[in-house]
Amino acid sequence: MKKIAIFDVCDTLYNVNTTFSFLNYYFKKHKNYLIFRKIIRLFPIKAINYLYYKFFGKDLIRIIGTFFLKNHNQSDIAKSSNIFVRNILSKEVKEKIFIKLKYYKKQGYYIVLMSGSYDFIIKEVANYFDANSYYASETQIINQLYTGRYKKDILMSKYNLFLKNFLQFEKLAVITNNKSDLKLLKLADYAYAVCNKKSDLRFWKHYSKINCIEDF
């Protein structure tokens, strides 16, 4: 049986959301995308997205943002993802979490990255950190072109994904900032919640077996 350490990626391994960081990087000169970025900063739009996420478990802004990938070539996205991870994301690594990753790797744990971010990004992130495997949201591709839609979105299904792929394990460590990963954290022998703001501490203090890693 394996000793497994699961690491979330966005706002856990990195200081940023990798989905929108990549979109901002890739479409930095795209007029319509820049307009979209301004619109989603408006409070009414944020409120609608929050309610949609709360009731339906879907990030509407994220879904709409993904439409911008439509008709972009798979190989171009792959090349840009590699550059993005090496040159941009490398400056956003959370040192405290990177130390945890190196520790569990040294202890012989099987390192798994689980993220709702795009698969083409997390593939490069897994290579960068030398992770053993990764799970991410799959983007749909037809004839080597992105359709702007998700083939499989794992944003809210990490717990079920883990149970499906790892039926037996000796020890489990989970490191994430996501409150939606609570069930996965409760399953872990070693559970760490990354607290990026003080309000996160208030949430996690109710769970005595979950250790908070302050990063604010």
What positions do the PLM features span?
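C-terminal cap/substrate-recognition subdomain and adjoining C-terminal extension
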Residues: 1-2, 79, 86-216
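Residue-level signal for pocket-adjacent positions within structured domains
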Residues: 8, 64, 145
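Active-site neighborhood of HAD-like aspartate-dependent phosphohydrolases
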Residues: 1-52
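Helix-loop "lid/cap" segments that line or gate small-molecule binding pockets
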Residues: 23, 48-53, 59-69
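Generic structural signal for well-ordered secondary structure
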Residues: 15-19, 57-58, 155
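Metal-dependent phosphoesterase signature
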Residues: 60-96
